[in-house]
A protein has these predicted regions:
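Short terminal or interdomain "cap/linker" segment that borders an active site or interface and mediates
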Residues: 141-178
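Short helix-capping/linker segments at secondary-structure and domain boundaries
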Residues: 24, 129-137
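Non-catalytic ligand/cofactor/substrate-binding and regulatory segments of enzyme domains
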Residues: 1-113, 159-161, 165-171
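Surface-exposed patches in mature extracellular/periplasmic domains of secreted proteins
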Residues: 107-111, 135-140
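Short glycine-/small-residue-rich flexible loop motifs, especially phosphate/cofactor-binding loops
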Residues: 96, 121, 125, 141
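An acidic- and aromatic-residue-enriched active-site/binding cleft used to recognize and process polar
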Residues: 31-33, 140-143
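Active-site nucleophilic cysteine motif
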Residues: 109-131
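Tryptophan-centered motif/residue detector
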Residues: 14-15, 118, 126, 149
């Protein structure tokens, strides 16, 4: 694909989050539907892979997990990770609160008109942006790309004005006016 797009080849990265609050650790990720026991993995949403039609079959579905005491299977292979993005409990809880609201377009497609396909990076970028975590400084490791990241940010920012017009602070839920 890099050759077709006339850009240098680089490593590709997959995003996931681990959120710690006093009572538990949660893993947030988008992954293939493994079996029919989604509740054990904290599945809060699901979508199709490739096409809506194919999504009728489990092999062509993904799930969004908010997995209490879950684990990221390939975390030991992570590059330049983990990265602490916030340290206060309020922000951590806000991240947990927005996960179930994440859009679930077809994975690998640009159904939301962002110019990038929707994937695991889109989900994590959307969750961070909608929860009030500053995403401007988050970058993939040197020499790498995180396809779909911009799609998640774009969709989150499209939704942001609705929240601000309503006069509600998207981080605290309180009034946005001082």
């Amino acid at each position: 694909m890099a050759t077709i797009e006339r850009r240098p080849a680089c490593d590709l990265y997959h995003s996931a989050l681990q959120v710690e609050v006093p009572e538990a650790r949660f893993v947030i990720e988008q992954a293939p539907v493994a079996d029919l026991s989604g509740e054990q993995r904290g599945v809060v949403a699901a979508g199709a892979v490739g096409s809506r039609w194919a999504g009728r079959f489990r092999i062509f579905r993904y799930e969004i997990r908010l997995w209490r005491n879950g684990h990221i299977p390939d975390v030991i292979e992570a590059v330049e990770s983990p990265r602490r993005l916030a340290s206060d409990e309020h922000r951590a809880r806000r991240v947990l609160d927005v996960v179930a609201q994440v859009p679930t377009p077809v994975w690998g497609r640009d159904e939301l008109g962002t110019g990038e396909m929707w994937n695991s990076n889109s989900v994590i970028a959307w969750v961070l942006a909608r929860s009030g975590i500053h995403t401007e400084s988050i970058r993939p490791p040197a020499g790498g790309r995180a396809p779909g990241w911009r799609a998640g940010l774009d969709v989150a920012h499209r939704q942001e004005p609705v929240t601000r017009r309503a006069g509600v602070d998207r981080l605290t839920g309180g009034s946005a006016h001082a």
